[in-house]
Amino acid sequence: MAGGREIKTKIKSVQNTRKVTRALEMVSASKIRKAQERMKTSRPYAQAMKQVIGHLAQASTDFQHPFLVEREQVKRVGYIVISSDRGLAGGLNNNLFRKMLGEVRPWQDTGAEIDVVTIGQKASAFFRRIKVNMVGSVTHLGDSPQVEQLIGVIKVMIDAFIEGKVDRVYLVYNRFVNTMTQKASFDQLLPLPAAEHKVAHHDWDYLYEPDAATVLEHVMTRYIESLVYQAVLENVASEHAARMVAMKAASDNANKMIGTLQLVYNKARQAAITQEISEIVSGAAAV
């Protein structure tokens, strides 16, 4: 059995760790509400953009935007993968990466090449480690990300799609369901799925200034940016929720460990006292 001093050192070490996990749990709990508010604030814009896209897609025009055209053969697939910058969030990132690799494998089996754009330090490190072709990356967005921080990496994938270098683009992120549940999501970004741009049947007739191609190009790009931005906000909320749950579990485990070590310490102390008494009694009997 370990000595009393060694056990007390272990107890002190676990207590210090518990202070850290409790602090991280409280910080994450305070950040979840703000993250949820940002999600709710951005949703009306995304919904309005979705409705406009639906109207424009069904409008009477000779111009068909490439974002709406499904390609017959898919030779290269692009992924925009969103992760956290920091760890200590349980299996949030690893579960997402594991499921994504499962989604990628069928494409690779057909001979399709894979390109990846990463948002977040964890995704960047993971895909560099497994040597996937990364064509863009952005990290350290903070707890209040701005759409301007994302435009560069989004443009990389949009340009690749327009130029025919990529035939399909997916958005991969953790969707925030509630504090206890975050769901790995894989949304087709380009070309826009039919359900995304279809509305109730109407013969929409628009006047375009300067022309349909210019207007659609601008609106479609803003819509894609809004989808990625919304996904980033969802992922931030998921990160804080996962970290809060993970740190609470760590704090609970620390409490159990401290209780166990305290019991071991008490037994060791009792054994030491009993031994001392026995030695004293034995010494007295010898005299």
From Swiss-Prot:
Example of a GO cellular component annotation carried by this entry: plasma membrane
Highest taxon of source: Bacteria
Pfam families given in the database record: ATP-synt
Keyword terms: ATP synthesis, Cell inner membrane, Cell membrane, CF(1), Hydrogen ion transport, Ion transport, Membrane, Transport
Compartments it resides in: Cell inner membrane
Keyword Cell inner membrane: yes
GO biological process, one term: proton motive force-driven plasma membrane ATP synthesis
CDD domains to which the protein is assigned, alphabetical: F1-ATPase_gamma (cd12151)
InterPro entries: ATP_synth_F1_ATPase_gsu (IPR035968), ATP_synth_F1_gsu (IPR000131), ATP_synth_F1_gsu_CS (IPR023632)
Similarity comment: Belongs to the ATPase gamma chain family.
Functional note: Produces ATP from ADP in the presence of a proton gradient across the membrane. The gamma chain is believed to be important in regulating ATPase activity and the flow of protons through the CF(0) complex.
Quaternary structure and interacting proteins, as annotated: F-type ATPases have 2 components, CF(1) - the catalytic core - and CF(0) - the membrane proton channel. CF(1) has five subunits: alpha(3), beta(3), gamma(1), delta(1), epsilon(1). CF(0) has three main subunits: a, b and c.
Protein name: ATP synthase gamma chain
